[in-house]
Amino acid sequence: MRKLLLSSTALATAAALTAGAAVADVSISAATEWSYNSRSSNVTANDGTTFGVDSEIAFKFSNKTDSGLTIGYVVELESDDDNTLINESSISIAGGFGKLVLGGNDGVGDNYGIEAEDAIAEESTPTVMSASIGTDTDISAMSGDANKVAYHLPAMGGFTAGASFADSGAVGSTDTTAFGFNYTMEAAGNTITIGGATATTGATTTDTDSQNLGVKVVSGNLTFIAAQSSLEKVDEDISSTGAGVSYKMANGMVLGAYTMKSEDDLDAGEEYTKSGVEVQYTIAAGLTAVINVDDYDYKIGTDNDSADTVADSGTMSKLTLKASF
């Protein structure tokens, strides 16, 4: 009788402790991609072939409170042989007021900015030696996945916007503030999205400022994007423009192409151009093959940031196998 009473008391206590506890929805997803890269360059150190791998596991938890708030937690873990670090880890609180994100995650520039290379699935970025020129039309990440606070307004019609702030520390002076917006509308059967973002990282001398503005038009299976970006900091005044297009075919294949150009007004003559084509093919659900071919050309300026900077041009070919779970 005493054992039964103790067991009943334990069960009642456990029930009381868990009655007010929320039961979270949990999801686990993973994505991995393997690539073969072949580069033909007039710089010997850049010429040759390499393998690449990029894998990630995401754990997501979500809970809806009695008051109507949605509380979420996400952690993304890199899962490559040489990289097993936590990439992002943040908590979110969402409701009628919008969404608040706290922790290590992207700044709002990544949420709202539109770049020309968004039209394709895989972007090859042939780097050039000791050059600080832009290689795409995206906003500069600046604070990356550093610990920050971000706020996103609730959607109002087709308009959304947000702001984020990353604190550099008690004695730091390199805080990063970012703002971004999207506006989507329908016109003549087309879906048009205008997106932009701006970010500033403070400094004791010259701040670093970056902006992006892009427009995306979706008409049936056809997508077109045009974008521009800028980056201003010590000894840099870089502007980049580009355009991209993709078309979804009936057989599951997606064709894409893009072009971009970047110039630094403070290094006269410094210029980077890149154009590429892409073919995506869905082999099976969750398995995709992507082929990219990119041509690039980098011209050095008359006032280079480094004496080691050299001109470079060539072709980058890439085969990527992507799997998602």
Q: Each predicted region: which residue ranges?
A:
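Outer-membrane beta-barrel proteins
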Residues: 1-325
